Regions:
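Acidic, low-complexity terminal tails and accessory targeting/binding regions
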Residues: 82-102, 138, 152-185
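Short beta-strand scaffold positions
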Residues: 52-53, 125, 145-146
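Histidine-centered divalent metal-coordination motifs
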Residues: 4, 147
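Generic beta-sheet signal
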Residues: 133, 140-146
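Active-site-proximal alpha-helix that buttresses catalytic centers in soluble enzyme cores
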Residues: 5-75, 99, 161-162
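A short, acidic, amphipathic alpha-helical segment used as a generic capping/interface helix at domain edges
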Residues: 123-137
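Phosphate-handling substructures
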Residues: 11-12, 16, 21-26, 68-126, ...
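Short coil/turn segments at beta-strand junctions that form active-site/ligand-binding loops
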Residues: 46-48, 138-142
Length: 185
């Protein structure tokens, strides 16, 4: 599980604890550096699949990782952030297709993000459905670019931007392993 790199929303919200009103933000320069560092940390793992949330910050992180590791990106709505801030208003599919023409978005509704705030129960259920599904796949060879809320729902942990955790979806009782911490300068 990879938390996307830093965005301007993250930077401002961390400093003020107020929603700065930025919709579907891009990564900052620091966030792009975090994504490149994550790619380096992932290289020895021999990944075969890269899943990303459809939010721009996750796709941009995934694109940097995919370019460095030679992986295709698969978009999944199920690993998106809990919808509760302005940054969780996504981009229309036409914009996503124009920016990432090699990524498939045809399976998503437009708009693909919720219309109302999601409860913690909703994102927890979504994370558990994802956990059950990924158990049937080659999960050791799969990386998922996702968000603070989804990682928290799945693991109970809060992690900084650019952090990589290894989870065993078949063992929800097992603590995730920290592969890389994005919490450095």
């Amino acid at each position: 599980m990879i938390r996307h790199g830093q965005t301007e929303f993250n930077r401002v919200f961390s400093a003020t604890r107020r929603d700065p009103g930025i919709r579907d933000p891009d990564l900052t320069d620091y966030g792009r550096r975090q994504a490149r560092a994550v790619a380096c940390a992932l290289r020895p793992l021999g990944l075969a699949k890269l899943i990303s949330s459809p939010y721009t910050r996750a796709l941009e992180t995934a694109e940097i990782i995919a370019d460095q590791l030679g992986l295709p990106i698969t978009v999944e709505r199920s690993v998106a952030e809990r919808f509760c801030f302005t940054c969780d208003i996504g981009s229309p599919l036409a914009e996503l297709r124009a920016r990432w023409p090699s990524v498939g978005f045809d399976h998503l509704d437009d708009p693909w993000w919720p219309k109302i705030e999601e409860t913690e129960e909703v994102i927890w259920r979504r994370s558990q459905i994802f956990r059950q599904r990924i158990c049937t796949e080659a999960w050791l060879e799969t990386a998922v670019v996702t968000h603070w809320g989804f990682i928290r729902a799945l693991t109970g942990l809060t992690v900084p931007n650019g952090t990589v955790l290894r989870i065993d979806p078949t063992r929800p009782d097992r603590e995730p392993e920290l592969i890389f911490s994005g919490d450095h300068g």
